[in-house]
């Protein structure tokens, strides 16, 4: 999955969770700092891939598949951020920015190993 798709799913999920309604393409464009037409194109692509439901003038919602992927991305972000703060001593803001970069490159296998490492050594930090 591309970094761009992951960013869209993450932003859509967080918006819907916070606002309890579909996100409009103009709102998502503003959040991602891109043109609404680019969001519309990606919404159509995400719909074809089965991640979102997209209805013009109503907005974008996540399918079960989209929710599952978004939660995995957010879990990855959270795990990396905790590691960076608790194990490497980064401040929250820097850790969040770095986690956003790293979450796209980290495989599921490495994420699981990182979780095991953190659990094993959490009392030694």
Curated annotation (Swiss-Prot):
Family: Belongs to the DtxR/MntR family.
Stored PANTHER family: IRON (METAL) DEPENDENT REPRESSOR, DTXR FAMILY (PTHR33238), IRON-DEPENDENT TRANSCRIPTIONAL REGULATOR (PTHR33238:SF7)
GO molecular function: DNA binding; DNA-binding transcription factor activity; protein dimerization activity; transition metal ion binding
Name of protein: Uncharacterized HTH-type transcriptional regulator MJ0568
Keyword Metal-binding: no
The HTH dtxR-type domain, residue ranges: 1-63
Keyword Transcription: yes
InterPro entries reported in the protein's UniProt record: DtxR_MntR_Metal-Reg, Fe_dep_repressor, Fe_dep_repressor_sf, HTH_DTXR, Iron_dep_repressor, WH-like_DNA-bd_sf, WH_DNA-bd_sf
Keywords: DNA-binding, Transcription, Transcription regulation
């Amino acid at each position: 999955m591309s970094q761009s798709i992951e960013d869209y799913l993450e932003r859509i999920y967080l918006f819907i969770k916070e606002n309890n309604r579909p996100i409009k393409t103009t709102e998502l464009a503003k959040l991602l700092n891109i043109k609404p037409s680019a969001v519309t194109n990606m919404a159509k692509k995400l719909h074809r891939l089965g991640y979102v439901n997209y209805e013009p003038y109503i907005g974008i919602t996540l399918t079960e598949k989209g929710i599952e992927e978004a939660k995995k991305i957010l879990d990855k972000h959270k795990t990396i951020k905790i590691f960076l703060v608790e194990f490497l001593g980064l401040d929250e803001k820097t850790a969040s920015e770095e986690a956003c970069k790293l979450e796209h490159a980290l495989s599921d296998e490495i994420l699981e190993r990182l979780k095991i490492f953190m659990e094993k050594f959490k009392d030694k930090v």
